[in-house]
């Protein structure tokens, strides 16, 4: 990576949503129902498969305006290299596509009228875990699901109604499964299921504060590094030591963080431009102006960051302003990422920003 903070993208490709890297130079991206293989260096590309869109999905996917309104994108993709399989959420379903057999399945419809999930975790044994992200509060349990090698989906753990609102993130570390929940203080938890044993109650590592509300976390040297998703107070990059149980804020950032990518000794992430909030005297949410001083959203730009674990250094790589369209209907402004990394390149997707629906490729290879 170049020593200066801001880096200019190597290339720009409109409407191409990056999904995963097949190798360090070959990217799979999604566009209008197609998975397309694109070699960054030769510029060769070819269609490798299709999502079977319904007539309604085809019509709504045709225009960027309606794609955004109905969230017709690939969310939370995971690539299983051994099986040549991409699993992801799309339009209210847990889906899978096999690059080798070209088979596409809508395996499981999400409950609670959910359009997507925020996190899918592929474990070392091939099992997949994901948590529900309800769109509506229907007074039912919010669940963690396990999807096995036979594509069977079963509930492994239930949060009772009213306990949490969303499951933000799930990941594996040392054979344990970690679950991160939100949104309000009493709903914000970081849990550990030891050896993925769901018969016993999980360990509660952190809970009860917006400082523990996160959608992006990475384990490094027995510490959890995580970014906060906090619309009320200043956001930051934190570390939590699993042994000492000490929490330390390492850096402040300009907004809530929902998307990130762990790449070797680096963590790439982006801030989001969403509603900036405070609580009134009745503990109700009140929207406030983005002024750089109050609330959790301190900038009307989405900022692309890189954190270097070895150097304990944070760099700003790019900034793009949120577009003029409604957050409620057309989404928060942010950069999205692939599900895995290339040692040479970083692929990002601009969402609800002034340069919208754009694949941006950056050179991140060390000098």
Q: Model regions: which residues?
A:
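A short beta-strand motif characteristic of beta-propeller blades
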Residues: 6-11, 46-48, 59-68, 103-111, ...
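Blade-level signature of beta-propeller repeat domains, shared across WD40, Kelch, NHL, RCC1
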Residues: 332-367
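Asp-box/WD-like beta-propeller blade repeats and closely related beta-sheet repeat scaffolds
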Residues: 99-123, 131, 139, 154-159
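Repeated scaffold domains used in trafficking and secretory/extracellular systems
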Residues: 12-24, 57-81, 112-122, 163-169, ...
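Loop/turn-rich, solvent-exposed surfaces of beta-rich toroidal or solenoidal domains
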Residues: 223-235, 251-325, 329-333
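Structural motif
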Residues: 33-37, 93-96, 137-145, 185-192, ...
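Entry beta-strands of beta-propeller and related beta-repeat scaffolds
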Residues: 25-27, 84-87, 126-130, 176-178, ...
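Recurrent small/Gly-Pro-centered beta-turn motifs in extracellular repeat architectures
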Residues: 30-32, 88-91, 130-134, 179-183, ...
């Amino acid at each position: 990576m170049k020593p200066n903070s801001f880096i200019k993208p190597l290339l720009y490709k409109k409407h191409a949503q990056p999904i995963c890297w097949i190798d360090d130079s070959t990217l799979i991206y999604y566009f209008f129902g197609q998975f397309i293989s694109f070699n960054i260096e030769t510029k060769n590309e070819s269609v490798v498969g299709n999502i079977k869109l319904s007539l309604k999905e085809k019509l709504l996917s045709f225009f960027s305006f309606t794609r955004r309104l109905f969230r017709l994108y690939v969310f939370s993709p995971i690539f299983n290299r051994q099986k040549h399989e991409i699993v992801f959420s799309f339009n209210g379903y847990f889906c899978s596509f096999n690059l080798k057999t070209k088979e596409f399945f809508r395996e499981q419809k999400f409950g609670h009228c959910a359009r997507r999930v925020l996190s899918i975790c592929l474990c070392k044994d091939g099992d997949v875990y994901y948590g529900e992200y309800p769109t509506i509060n229907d007074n039912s349990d919010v669940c963690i699901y396990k999807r096995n090698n036979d594509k069977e989906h079963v509930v492994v753990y239930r949060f009772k109604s009213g306990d949490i609102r969303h499951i933000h993130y799930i990941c594996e570390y040392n054979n344990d499964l970690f679950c991160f929940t939100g949104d309000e203080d009493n709903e914000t938890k970081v849990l550990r299921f030891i050896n993925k044993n769901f018969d016993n109650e999980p360990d509660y590592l952190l809970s009860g504060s917006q400082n523990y509300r996160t959608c992006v976390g990475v384990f490094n040297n027995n510490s959890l590094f995580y970014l906060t998703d906090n619309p009320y107070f200043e956001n930051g990059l934190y570390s939590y030591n699993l042994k000492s149980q000490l929490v330390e804020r390492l850096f402040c950032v300009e907004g809530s963080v929902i998307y990130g990518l762990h790449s070797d000794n680096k963590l790439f992430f982006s801030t989001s431009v969403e509603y900036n909030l405070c609580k009134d005297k009745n503990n109700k949410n009140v929207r406030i102006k983005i002024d750089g001083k109050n609330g959790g959203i301190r900038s009307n730009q989405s900022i692309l960051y890189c954190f270097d674990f070895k150097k304990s250094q944070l760099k700003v790589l790019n900034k793009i302003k949120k577009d003029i369209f409604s957050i409620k209907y057309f989404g928060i402004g942010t950069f999205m990422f692939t599900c895995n990394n290339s040692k040479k390149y970083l692929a990002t997707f601009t969402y609800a920003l002034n340069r919208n629906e754009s694949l941006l490729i950056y050179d991140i290879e060390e000098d």
